[in-house]
Amino acid sequence: MSNIRQEMPVLARHEGDWIGTYTLVDLEGKILDKHESHLSCQFPDNSLDSYYQINRYKWSDGKQEEHKFPGMYRDKTLWFDTERIQGKAWEVDNSTLILWFSYKTAPAMYLYEMIQISPDNNHRARTWQWFKNHQIYQRTLIQEQRLS
Protein backbone atom coordinates (compact mmCIF):
# COMPACT_ATOMS: atom_id res chain seq x y z
CA MET A 1 0.00 0.00 0.00
CA SER A 2 1.43 3.38 -0.99
CA ASN A 3 1.42 6.36 1.33
CA ILE A 4 0.07 9.69 0.09
CA ARG A 5 2.11 11.66 2.65
CA GLN A 6 5.39 10.12 1.47
CA GLU A 7 4.68 10.16 -2.26
CA MET A 8 3.06 13.63 -2.34
CA PRO A 9 5.09 15.57 0.27
CA VAL A 10 4.05 18.99 -1.06
CA LEU A 11 0.37 18.07 -0.64
CA ALA A 12 1.10 16.82 2.90
CA ARG A 13 2.42 20.31 3.79
CA HIS A 14 -1.09 21.69 3.17
CA GLU A 15 -2.63 19.72 6.05
CA GLY A 16 -4.55 21.97 8.44
CA ASP A 17 -6.88 24.95 8.28
CA TRP A 18 -6.49 27.92 5.96
CA ILE A 19 -8.29 31.27 5.87
CA GLY A 20 -8.24 33.68 2.98
CA THR A 21 -9.99 35.62 0.27
CA TYR A 22 -11.22 34.52 -3.16
CA THR A 23 -11.39 37.26 -5.80
CA LEU A 24 -13.03 36.38 -9.12
CA VAL A 25 -12.03 38.62 -12.05
CA ASP A 26 -12.91 38.80 -15.73
CA LEU A 27 -10.27 38.88 -18.47
CA GLU A 28 -9.81 42.63 -18.06
CA GLY A 29 -9.28 42.32 -14.29
CA LYS A 30 -12.70 43.65 -13.24
CA ILE A 31 -13.79 42.13 -9.92
CA LEU A 32 -16.87 39.95 -10.41
CA ASP A 33 -17.05 38.44 -6.90
CA LYS A 34 -15.12 38.46 -3.65
CA HIS A 35 -15.62 36.32 -0.56
CA GLU A 36 -13.85 34.96 2.51
CA SER A 37 -12.84 31.33 2.83
CA HIS A 38 -11.94 28.75 5.46
CA LEU A 39 -10.54 25.49 4.08
CA SER A 40 -9.70 22.34 6.05
CA CYS A 41 -7.25 19.90 4.44
CA GLN A 42 -7.22 16.52 6.17
CA PHE A 43 -5.62 13.09 5.86
CA PRO A 44 -8.01 10.73 7.68
CA ASP A 45 -6.34 8.34 10.11
CA ASN A 46 -8.23 5.31 8.85
CA SER A 47 -6.42 5.20 5.49
CA LEU A 48 -2.98 5.96 4.09
CA ASP A 49 -4.53 6.81 0.73
CA SER A 50 -7.36 9.17 1.67
CA TYR A 51 -7.64 12.94 1.58
CA TYR A 52 -10.58 15.07 2.69
CA GLN A 53 -11.13 18.79 2.16
CA ILE A 54 -13.91 21.03 3.43
CA ASN A 55 -14.34 24.45 1.79
CA ARG A 56 -16.40 27.06 3.64
CA TYR A 57 -17.23 30.36 1.95
CA LYS A 58 -18.78 33.53 3.38
CA TRP A 59 -19.90 36.64 1.48
CA SER A 60 -20.40 40.13 2.90
CA ASP A 61 -24.19 39.87 2.29
CA GLY A 62 -24.41 36.90 4.68
CA LYS A 63 -24.49 34.15 2.04
CA GLN A 64 -22.59 31.02 3.07
CA GLU A 65 -21.63 27.77 1.35
CA GLU A 66 -19.86 24.59 2.43
CA HIS A 67 -18.52 21.90 0.10
CA LYS A 68 -16.79 18.60 0.91
CA PHE A 69 -14.21 16.98 -1.35
CA PRO A 70 -13.05 13.46 -0.53
CA GLY A 71 -10.08 12.38 -2.60
CA MET A 72 -8.30 9.11 -3.28
CA TYR A 73 -4.59 8.76 -3.92
CA ARG A 74 -3.20 6.65 -6.76
CA ASP A 75 0.03 6.83 -8.79
CA LYS A 76 1.31 10.13 -7.34
CA THR A 77 -2.01 11.77 -8.19
CA LEU A 78 -4.93 12.79 -5.97
CA TRP A 79 -8.25 11.96 -7.68
CA PHE A 80 -11.63 13.57 -6.98
CA ASP A 81 -15.01 12.23 -8.09
CA THR A 82 -17.90 13.71 -6.11
CA GLU A 83 -21.50 14.57 -6.93
CA ARG A 84 -20.24 18.09 -7.81
CA ILE A 85 -16.83 17.72 -9.49
CA GLN A 86 -14.34 15.36 -11.04
CA GLY A 87 -10.66 16.12 -11.18
CA LYS A 88 -7.10 15.40 -10.19
CA ALA A 89 -4.13 17.09 -8.51
CA TRP A 90 -0.41 16.45 -8.85
CA GLU A 91 2.89 17.97 -7.72
CA VAL A 92 5.19 19.77 -10.15
CA ASP A 93 8.04 20.91 -7.87
CA ASN A 94 8.82 21.36 -4.16
CA SER A 95 6.21 24.09 -3.61
CA THR A 96 3.61 23.73 -6.38
CA LEU A 97 0.48 21.65 -6.95
CA ILE A 98 -1.64 21.70 -10.09
CA LEU A 99 -5.34 20.85 -9.85
CA TRP A 100 -7.59 20.23 -12.85
CA PHE A 101 -11.31 19.83 -12.33
CA SER A 102 -14.65 20.20 -14.03
CA TYR A 103 -18.15 20.61 -12.68
CA LYS A 104 -20.43 17.72 -13.57
CA THR A 105 -23.31 20.11 -14.26
CA ALA A 106 -21.24 22.10 -16.81
CA PRO A 107 -19.27 19.65 -18.99
CA ALA A 108 -18.00 22.36 -21.40
CA MET A 109 -16.34 24.17 -18.48
CA TYR A 110 -13.17 23.23 -16.59
CA LEU A 111 -10.40 24.94 -14.69
CA TYR A 112 -6.74 24.61 -13.85
CA GLU A 113 -5.53 25.75 -10.45
CA MET A 114 -1.92 26.46 -9.49
CA ILE A 115 -1.33 26.23 -5.74
CA GLN A 116 1.90 27.61 -4.24
CA ILE A 117 2.84 26.98 -0.60
CA SER A 118 5.50 29.10 1.10
CA PRO A 119 8.73 27.55 2.42
CA ASP A 120 7.52 28.08 6.01
CA ASN A 121 4.21 26.31 5.14
CA ASN A 122 2.14 29.22 6.49
CA HIS A 123 1.01 31.00 3.31
CA ARG A 124 -0.60 29.90 0.06
CA ALA A 125 -1.20 31.68 -3.23
CA ARG A 126 -3.65 30.04 -5.61
CA THR A 127 -4.82 30.95 -9.10
CA TRP A 128 -7.74 29.38 -10.96
CA GLN A 129 -7.95 29.76 -14.72
CA TRP A 130 -11.50 29.07 -15.92
CA PHE A 131 -12.14 27.69 -19.42
CA LYS A 132 -15.37 27.29 -21.35
CA ASN A 133 -15.23 25.47 -24.70
CA HIS A 134 -11.42 25.56 -24.31
CA GLN A 135 -11.30 29.38 -24.08
CA ILE A 136 -10.28 31.21 -20.91
CA TYR A 137 -13.04 33.48 -19.62
CA GLN A 138 -12.20 34.37 -15.99
CA ARG A 139 -9.72 33.85 -13.16
CA THR A 140 -9.94 33.41 -9.40
CA LEU A 141 -7.12 34.81 -7.25
CA ILE A 142 -6.79 33.33 -3.76
CA GLN A 143 -4.52 34.43 -0.93
CA GLU A 144 -4.47 32.35 2.26
CA GLN A 145 -2.71 31.99 5.57
CA ARG A 146 -2.55 29.01 7.86
CA LEU A 147 -5.00 29.07 10.77
CA SER A 148 -3.73 25.82 12.32
Q: Whereabouts are the PLM-identified features?
A:
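Sparse, context-dependent recognition of short Cys/His-centered cofactor- or disulfide-binding micro-motifs
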Residues: 3, 24-26, 82-84, 100-102, ...
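Surface-exposed coil/turn segments at beta-strand junctions on protein surfaces, enriched
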Residues: 11-13, 92, 119
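Central antiparallel beta-sheet cores of small beta-barrel/beta-sandwich binding domains
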Residues: 32-112
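Glycine-rich, aromatic-bearing surface loops/beta-hairpins
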Residues: 103, 107-148
